[in-house]
């Protein structure tokens, strides 16, 4: 092999190794920013055909309805515990902070946080549904899959 060809080969190999390393570093950095969405039934029964369940310590978002009678507030702190439910699953959520004004029992919410065990999420953020006609697309799709005969919500914006 002549020296010129050998130098080109070394250069190409170094570029490929550099690109591979850069890709690996980007994927590693983005790994911590991925929050998967689950419904309570997907957390209990598994998601998809493989029935994959989230693992403790995993960051995730879970959406469902606040179970009536399940909201427990600590009178001395901002700590709140409540249960989320859907068609076939119930999970508990604990949150330390100020809840949105629209948060109430029977209301749809999305809690973002870390899974402590199979059915308990420690939420870092709680989002409440902001309009009775609006349902987040992820929740609407999940509810349509669980209840295909029922109309869940309408994402369209209607003039007042």
From Swiss-Prot:
Keyword entries, A-Z: Cell inner membrane, Cell membrane, Cytochrome c-type biogenesis, Heme, Iron, Membrane, Metal-binding, Signal-anchor, Transmembrane, Transmembrane helix
Q: Which Pfam families match?
A: CcmE (PF03100)
Membrane-related topology note: Single-pass type II membrane protein
Instruction: Give any Gene Ontology cellular component.
Output: plasma membrane
Q: Which GO terms describe its biological process?
A: cytochrome complex assembly
Bias category Basic and acidic residues: which stretches? 133-148
Where are the stretches annotated Disordered? 133-160
Topology feature Cytoplasmic, residues: 1-8
Provide the membrane-side ranges marked Periplasmic in the record.
30-160
Q: List, in alphabetical order, the Gene Ontology terms for molecular function in this entry.
A: heme binding; metal ion binding
Which top-level group of life is the source organism from? Bacteria
Q: Which SUPFAM superfamilies match?
A: Heme chaperone CcmE
Residues annotated for heme binding in this entry = 130, 134
List where in the cell it is found. Answer: Cell inner membrane
Q: Does the keyword Oxidoreductase apply?
A: no
Q: What is its main location?
A: membrane
Name the family: Belongs to the CcmE/CycJ family.
Function comment: Heme chaperone required for the biogenesis of c-type cytochromes. Transiently binds heme delivered by CcmC and transfers the heme to apo-cytochromes in a process facilitated by CcmF and CcmH.
Stated name of the protein: Cytochrome c-type biogenesis protein CcmE
């Amino acid at each position: 092999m002549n020296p010129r060809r050998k130098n080109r080969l070394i250069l190409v190999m170094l570029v490929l190794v550099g690109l591979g390393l850069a890709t690996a570093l980007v994927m590693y950095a983005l790994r911590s920013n991925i929050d998967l969405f689950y419904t309570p039934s997907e957390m209990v029964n598994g998601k998809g055909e493989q029935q994959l369940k989230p693992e403790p310590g995993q960051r995730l978002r879970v959406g469902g309805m606040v179970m009536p009678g399940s909201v427990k507030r600590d009178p001395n702190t901002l700590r709140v515990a409540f249960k989320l439910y859907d068609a076939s699953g119930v999970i508990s959520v604990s949150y330390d902070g100020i809840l949105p004004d629209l948060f109430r029992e029977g209301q749809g919410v999305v809690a973002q946080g870390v899974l402590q065990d199979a059915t308990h999420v420690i939420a870092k953020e709680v989002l409440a549904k902001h309009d009775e006609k609006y349902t987040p697309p992820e929740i609407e799709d999940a509810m349509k899959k669980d209840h295909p005969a029922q109309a869940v919500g309408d994402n369209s914006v209607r003039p007042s």
